[in-house]
Amino acid sequence: MNIQQGKVWKFGENIDTDLIIAARYLNTSDPQVLASHVMEDARPDFLQHFTKGDFIVAGENFGCGSSREHAPVALKTAGVSAVIAKSFARIFYRNSFNTGLPILEVKETDEIREGDTLEVDMAQGTIKNLTRNQTYAFKPIPPFMMELLESGGLIEHAKAKIAQGVL
């Protein structure tokens, strides 16, 4: 998980959870079904061009709206390596870590363009834009949150701790 490379899919400000996964699909909790509809209201052809391992880059307040966990589950299951944005809605922030989806706060998202190739180094806290030869630092992820990501989310983390006899 430390270094990931992929292409950028650029979105704007205030991308709410209804744009990430529309409410009409909330009658299921099947991650594969959710993933098959991710971002379709924001960009109907998104999944036709998206490649697992790519990144979503956005502006302020990504994940605003409802508190549903379906949104980060859909993104993670679709294969989004990380969501990079200027800021995140707080409940989306926590839900993302709980489900094991890396989200990175970077103020310079305006400098990143659709189609750029990024290399994200989680350990170093850096994002290299290989297309534009630029490097950005992201807000450090607290150690416990990194543990959640490395475990695949809160449930998997708890299972591992139980198996170790820690919980």
Curated annotation (Swiss-Prot):
InterPro entries: Aconitase/3IPM_dehydase_swvl (IPR015928), AconitaseA/IPMdHydase_ssu_swvl (IPR000573), IPMI_Swivel (IPR033940), LeuD (IPR050075), LeuD_type2/HacB/DmdB (IPR011827). It is an enzyme of class 4 (lyase). It catalyses: (2R,3S)-3-isopropylmalate = (2S)-2-isopropylmalate. GO terms for molecular function: 3-isopropylmalate dehydratase activity. Pathway: Amino-acid biosynthesis; L-leucine biosynthesis; L-leucine from 3-methyl-2-oxobutanoate: step 2/4. GO terms for biological process: L-leucine biosynthetic process. Transmembrane segments: none annotated. PANTHER family: 3-ISOPROPYLMALATE DEHYDRATASE SMALL SUBUNIT 1, 3-ISOPROPYLMALATE DEHYDRATASE SMALL SUBUNIT 2-RELATED-RELATED. Heterodimer of LeuC and LeuD. Catalyzes the isomerization between 2-isopropylmalate and 3-isopropylmalate, via the formation of 2-isopropylmaleate. This is 3-isopropylmalate dehydratase small subunit. The lineage of its organism: Bacteria, Pseudomonadati, Campylobacterota, Epsilonproteobacteria, Campylobacterales. The gene is leuD.
